[in-house]
Structures are given as C-alpha cells and as structure tokens.
Design a protein with these regions (language model features):
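Conserved RecA-like ASCE P-loop NTPase motor core of nucleic-acid helicases/translocases
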Residues: 119-123
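P-loop (Walker A) phosphate-binding loop of NTP-binding proteins
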Residues: 97, 124
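Peripheral, non-AAA+ core regions of ATP-driven protein-machinery
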Residues: 2-12, 16-80, 87-93, 100-110, ...
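Divalent metal-dependent catalytic cores for phosphoryl transfer on phosphate-bearing substrates
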Residues: 128
Length: 453
C-alpha cells in the first residue's frame, strides 16, 4: 500500500507547502502551517465550480438589475445590521466568542422567520433535544422550525434538496466534513470546501444561509481567509461576558452598510434589542465630574453618544499613556498636539483614557472630545452639564470636520444635550432648537472656549 503524501497547510490563508516552515510563504504569518494528508488526484470530482451561476459575456448596461428584496427577521437590531433584512440566496457568516449568544440569536431569528417561510436549523454542536430545551427556556414556539443534528455535508445538502427551506442556519461551519476529503472537520480544506458547497447551493436554490464560525484566541474568525471572501456578509458578535449587552457589527456586507452595529441585551428570555443604545455608553453622574466629555460618534449609519473619560495624574520617572477603546498611538499624538499648539503640557503626567461601556472607537472624530476630557481632568474642573464635542484634530492643530455632522448634532439635541463644540465646517446653517453650538477652527480656540464655559 502506497504511503499517503504529507503536505503542510496554512490555517490563515489555506496555502500549501511540501515541508514545514516557520513562516508561511504565501501570507507571511508565523507558526500557521499544519500537517495534513494530500488529497489523491482525481478525488472531489466536479468540486471546481463557480459559486454563482455562470453567464455569457454581455454589456453592463444591458443586464437587467432587479432591486434586492429583503425579508425582516423579526429582530429589529439584526435587521439594521443586515441592511433591512435577509436577502434571497444570501450567505451570512457570523462569528463570536464561545457563549456570547450566537446560537441564541439565530434560534430566535429562525423561530420568528418560521411564521412566514420554511426554515431549517442544522446543528453540529448540539443534539436536537438540546436545541429544543434551549428553545423552551427562551419561550419560543418552534412548531414550524425544522431541526437536523448532522455534520456530514452530503447529508445536509440532501436535506436542503428535500426540504427546500427559504432560510437555513448551519451551526457551525467548523464542525462539518465532506466525504470527498480525508482531512478532519475544522481543517482548512474542509472549512473551505464545505463553505463553497453551501454557498453554491444557496445561490442556486435561493435559500438564505447563515454560517456560524468559530474565532481564534485573538478574536479573528477561525479558518482560511477565503471563507470571509466567498460569503456575502460577515458579522462579528462582540461583548463582555461580565456585561449583559452584546454588539453585532457588520464587517462586510454586499447588501448594506459596513460597520453598522446592532445592540442587544441578554435576558432570561434571550436577546432583546436596545432601542436607545446611547444610554449604555453614558455614565449616570448626579453632578458633572472632571475628565468626562460626551462624544457623538458614528457606527455605520447610527449616531451614538459615548462618554470619554480621562484621568491625568502625577506620574513617576516614566509617565504612562493608557487607553481603553481608543488607539494608544493616537492618544500619544493628541497629547503632542495639545502641548505644541495649546500650551498644555502632560509630559510628566500619567494619562489614562477610557471609552465607557466597552465600545471601540476607531474614527478620528473622537479627537476633540479626548483632548477636552484630558484638559478637564488636568484642570480639575468639570465640563458643563449637557456638553458634547466631536471633530478630528490634525498635527498642525487644526480641527477638521467630521462626516454627517448635522445628524450627530440632531441626535445630541434629541437626547437633551444643550452645549456643543464642533468644527466650523460642521456648524449648521440653521440653529438647532435647544442646542448652543460653538464652532472652532483650531485646538487652542477650543481650549480657550472651554475655560470660559
């Protein structure tokens, strides 16, 4: 009997190499090559097919483009992230830490959709009895939900052919295996091939398919990167296990906006949408406190009010710069701008900055709020009640406009905020009722204005 040929496959990009190397020659990642058995030539017949239906060459203007019809899932926050609902034939990949609530969210969505279409829930991690027990604990009806406990791809495809569901959940893609491959479930080859087959089936049948994906210790989706490329939508389920709040964030969406977020609260009856998520990210102080400034940030298309807290304290021989929820390098840059252009020195001080509620802020529009919070903490004087700020700060000390400034200001006014410092380019042409707006062009103007408030 001939000895099986051994190859080494990168678990990050899926590239192969005949011998082990510390660094993948394809993507440059370290310690990602894993030993596997090479597939014999001729195996996997008809595996190499297009994910979508092939068509002859035609002029773009002549192709008839129909509007994408969406079906609401019954969960408003999930619909917001998806762009309004599920799309026929769309493939969604959702990842998150173990126990974060992925299966709970999808079971609730399946139950809600079962009232208007045929649905199928395929579980490879639980038995059918366990799924039923969880559904009863959540108070779900489940009378129209079809459940299959299976990990073999060919049997799942046969079930999809027989049942003809309009919506299907695969929990999870890492547990599936195909008879065409000899590698173990969860390997790069198995994940890639199973996802490709399911995507092909979804496009051909029009069945919307949701794939649940595992994540690595670093928080990235496990499996080859190609998995994220072939699906239509990639969602990340985020949240602290010590908190009851969860965020669903769209990283990729062919049918809607990216970086859109949905906010859920975990209750004893499952996940409930949070209609006013700004309340989560704002602290409830009886009186204004030094070092606290409210920022209006954008998450996708949704304006959110987030409290930025800063603490400036006398440091030792090597002052520290720590930030939670914001980029540390950007904090160091802002402190240099504050010193050079506003004359506020923090070189011998420890500076700590935190975004309340565990939210991650990546947009530069947070710069001005961070600087004002630091200045407030350094002076030991609180900002006025009902104060907000936003704007990007450049190295020359200029305050640049933030995108969609009018929407940010209207959201702040709606929630009862009364004073704002914003970039001059974001100042509204018409006054906003109940909101006093101070427009600035430079950092030193903002700091000087702050002293007079």
């Amino acid at each position: 009997m001939a000895k099986d040929k051994t190859i080494y496959t990168c678990n990050a990009c899926g590239g192969t190499n005949p011998k082990w190397l510390g660094k993948c020659p394809h993507c440059g990642e370290w310690n990602t090559l894993e030993e596997s058995i090479a597939e014999p030539s001729g195996s996997g017949k008809n595996r190499f097919q297009a994910l979508a239906k092939s068509s002859p060459v035609s002029t773009l203007a002549d192709i008839e483009a129909a509007d994408v019809e969406r079906t609401p899932t019954g969960l408003d926050e999930l619909d917001r992230v998806l762009g309004g609902g599920i799309v026929e034939g769309g493939v969604v990949l959702i990842g998150g830490d173990p126990g974060i609530g992925k299966s709970t969210l999808l079971l609730q969505a399946v139950d809600a959709l079962s009232r208007q279409m045929k649905v199928l829930y395929v579980t490879g991690e639980e038995s059918g009895a366990q799924v039923a027990l969880r559904a009863r604990r959540l108070g779900l009806d489940g009378s129209q939900v079809r459940v299959q406990a299976e990990i073999q791809l060919e049997r799942i495809l046969a079930t999809l052919e027989a049942e003809q569901p309009a919506f299907c959940v695969i929990d999870s893609i890492q547990t599936l295996y195909s008879d065409q491959l000899s590698s173990a479930p969860g390997s790069v080859a198995q994940v890639r091939e199973c996802a490709a087959h399911l995507t092909r089936t979804a496009k051909a049948s029009g069945c919307t398919t949701v794939l649940v994906g595992h994540v690595t210790k670093e928080g990235a989706l496990a499996g080859p990167r190609v998995l994220e490329h072939i699906v239509d939508t990639v969602l990340y389920f985020e949240g602290d296990t010590h908190s009851s709040f969860r965020l669903v964030r769209a990283i990729k969406n062919r049918f809607g906006a990216v970086n859109e977020i949905g906010v859920f609260a975990m209750t004893d009856k499952g996940l409930k949408g949070v209609t006013n998520p700004s309340a989560i990210f704002l602290s409830t102080h009886s009186e204004p406190v030094p070092g606290s400034c409210v920022l209006v940030t954008l998450e996708g298309t949704r304006p959110l009010l987030v409290e930025i807290q800063a603490l400036v304290d006398s440091g030792g021989p090597s002052p520290r710069r720590l930030s939670v929820g914001l980029e540390r390098d950007r904090l160091a840059m802002l402190l240099a701008v504050l010193h050079r252009h506003a004359g506020v020195a923090c070189s011998d001080q420890d500076v700590f900055v935190n975004a309340v509620g565990g939210v991650r802020i990546s947009e530069p529009a947070a710069d001005l709020a961070v600087l004002l919070a630091i200045q407030s903490s350094l002076r030991g004087k609180a900002l006025p009640r009902g104060f907000i700020a936003f704007g990007e700060v450049g190295l020359a000390g200029e305050v640049r406009p933030a995108p969609r400034g009018q929407e940010r200001l209207k959201e702040a006014a709606k929630l009862g905020f009364s004073v704002a410092i914003v970039p001059k380019a974001n100042a509204p042409k018409k006054p906003i009722e109940g909101l006093t707006i101070h427009a600035v062009e430079r950092v030193e103007q903002a700091i000087e204005l702050l002293r007079g408030l």
